[in-house]
């Protein structure tokens, strides 16, 4: 039996694409193992899938000054030795890396063990982890056509992003039942990313009366961000984080407000959900979400509201515009030729398996 080690972590966006590949890889006869961080979000998600998980030391990679920049390289080095030992023992035929700081030691360790590595970059420009890992990769899968020029060494392959099959098979009635909605108002789903978004949470709750006059709200607000005062608010259902329930909640929604991570926006495209994107600003990111959002806005798939322009009036104005023009966005998304990347990526994995 062929064996693959997968890696990726830090946020759900570095894990869920791996899960999308798992059923197809199993169908192709691969035994799957996973290397991730000790305390990252990926550990709980992967172990829940029944996949053997190997935790390693990992240091966060930062583009800004921090005292931990002096200690974290030693954590990365420790992670390389740990990953090298795991890879030597497990003898995988190939490694698949989805990005995130934990992947750098794994990719380097695979290279040292002469194991081929396929990486995947979701955003238009590569994150720091994938930039550092690219020299040790065999091929780098990309999601946007614009990304090819940003990958060094002629290693880029345009594959699209992998989307979990179950996400496309949600049940609308189950989603509505889960939220306890009793009327027929259109449903607005708000997603702030797996860690939540303080600024989106605050402005939505500040304008709750206004929004609830037109919509029922599903609010995925992130860990420790539930508001106890709103627990029994009619038409408002809040969740810290959802996994199995997400397909049903997505199916139930008519509009979506979201950050602009590549994974989630491609999921919205696949589901043809009219969406308002609020990308992370350059103050708190490297600007990748701004580029992602601009690409989708240009294609007519999304309406965009910059974080710097996020105010009560602009939010309500954009939301009303999106609802009034929802069919235009649905029609534009219906014309998209973007494929689910599962088949393209698994074919590449097959090709480079030792």
Curated annotation (Swiss-Prot):
Pathway: Cell wall biogenesis; peptidoglycan biosynthesis. GO terms for molecular function: glycosyltransferase activity; UDP-N-acetyl-D-glucosamine:N-acetylmuramoyl-L-alanyl-D-glutamyl-meso-2,6-diaminopimelyl-D-alanyl-D-alanine-diphosphoundecaprenol 4-beta-N-acetylglucosaminlytransferase activity; undecaprenyldiphospho-muramoylpentapeptide beta-N-acetylglucosaminyltransferase activity. It is an enzyme of class 2 (transferase). It holds the Pfam family Glyco_tran_28_C. It is found in: Cell membrane. InterPro entries: GlcNAc_MurG, Glyco_trans_28_C, GlycoTrans_28_N. It is a peripheral membrane protein. GO terms for biological process: carbohydrate metabolic process; cell division; cell wall organization; lipid glycosylation; peptidoglycan biosynthetic process; regulation of cell shape. It catalyses: di-trans,octa-cis-undecaprenyl diphospho-N-acetyl-alpha-D-muramoyl-L-alanyl-D-glutamyl-meso-2,6-diaminopimeloyl-D-alanyl-D-alanine + UDP-N-acetyl-alpha-D-glucosamine = di-trans,octa-cis-undecaprenyl diphospho-[N-acetyl-alpha-D-glucosaminyl-(1->4)]-N-acetyl-alpha-D-muramoyl-L-alanyl-D-glutamyl-meso-2,6-diaminopimeloyl-D-alanyl-D-alanine + UDP + H(+). UDP-N-acetyl-alpha-D-glucosamine binds at residues 11-13, 164, 194, 289. GO terms for cellular component: plasma membrane. Gene3D superfamilies: Glycogen Phosphorylase B. Keywords: Cell cycle, Cell division, Cell membrane, Cell shape, Cell wall biogenesis/degradation, Glycosyltransferase, Membrane, Peptidoglycan synthesis, Transferase. Its EC number is 2.4.1.227. PANTHER family: UDP-N-ACETYLGLUCOSAMINE--N-ACETYLMURAMYL-(PENTAPEPTIDE) PYROPHOSPHORYL-UNDECAPRENOL N-ACETYLGLUCOSAMINE TRANSFERASE (PTHR21015:SF27), UDP-N-ACETYLGLUCOSAMINE--N-ACETYLMURAMYL-(PENTAPEPTIDE) PYROPHOSPHORYL-UNDECAPRENOL N-ACETYLGLUCOSAMINE TRANSFERASE 1 (PTHR21015). Cell wall formation. Catalyzes the transfer of a GlcNAc subunit on undecaprenyl-pyrophosphoryl-MurNAc-pentapeptide (lipid intermediate I) to form undecaprenyl-pyrophosphoryl-MurNAc-(pentapeptide)GlcNAc (lipid intermediate II). Belongs to the glycosyltransferase 28 family. MurG subfamily. This is UDP-N-acetylglucosamine--N-acetylmuramyl-(pentapeptide) pyrophosphoryl-undecaprenol N-acetylglucosamine transferase.
């Amino acid at each position: 039996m062929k064996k693959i080690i997968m890696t990726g972590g830090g946020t759900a966006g570095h894990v869920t694409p791996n899960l999308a590949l798992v059923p197809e890889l199993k169908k192709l006869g691969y035994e799957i193992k996973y290397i991730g961080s000790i305390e990252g979000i990926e550990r709980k998600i992967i172990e829940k899938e029944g996949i053997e998980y190997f935790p390693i030391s990992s240091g966060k990679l930062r583009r800004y000054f921090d005292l931990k920049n002096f200690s974290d390289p030693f954590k990365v080095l420790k992670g390389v030795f740990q990953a090298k030992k795991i890879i030597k023992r497990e003898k995988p035929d190939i490694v698949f890396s989805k990005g995130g700081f934990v992947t750098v030691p794994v990719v380097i360790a695979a290279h040292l063990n002469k194991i081929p590595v396929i990486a995947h970059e979701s955003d238009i420009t590569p994150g720091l982890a994938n930039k550092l890992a690219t020299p040790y990769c065999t091929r780098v899968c990309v999601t946007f056509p614009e990304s090819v020029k940003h990958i060094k060494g002629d290693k880029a392959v345009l594959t699209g992003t992998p989307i979990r099959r179950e996400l496309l098979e949600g049940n609308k009635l189950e989603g509505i039942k889960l939220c306890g909605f009793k009327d027929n108002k259109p449903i607005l789903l708000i997603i702030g990313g797996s860690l939540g978004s303080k600024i989106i949470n605050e402005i939505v709750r500040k304008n709750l009366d206004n929004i609830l006059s037109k919509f029922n709200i599903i609010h995925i607000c992130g860990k420790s961000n539930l508001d106890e005062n709103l627990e029994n608010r009619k038409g408002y259902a809040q969740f810290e984080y959802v996994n199995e329930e997400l397909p049903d909640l997505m199916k139930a929604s008519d509009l979506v407000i979201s950050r602009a991570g590549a994974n989630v926006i491609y999921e919205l495209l696949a589901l043809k959900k009219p969406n308002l994107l609020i990308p992370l600003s350059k103050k708190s990111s490297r600007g990748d979400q701004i580029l992602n959002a601009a690409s989708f806005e240009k294609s007519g798939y999304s309406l965009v509201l910059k974080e710097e322009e996020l105010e009560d009036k602009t939010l309500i104005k954009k939301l009303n515009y999106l609802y009034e023009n929802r069919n235009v966005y649905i029609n534009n998304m219906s014309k998209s030729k973007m494929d689910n990347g599962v088949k393209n990526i698994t074919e590449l994995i097959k090709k480079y398996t030792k």
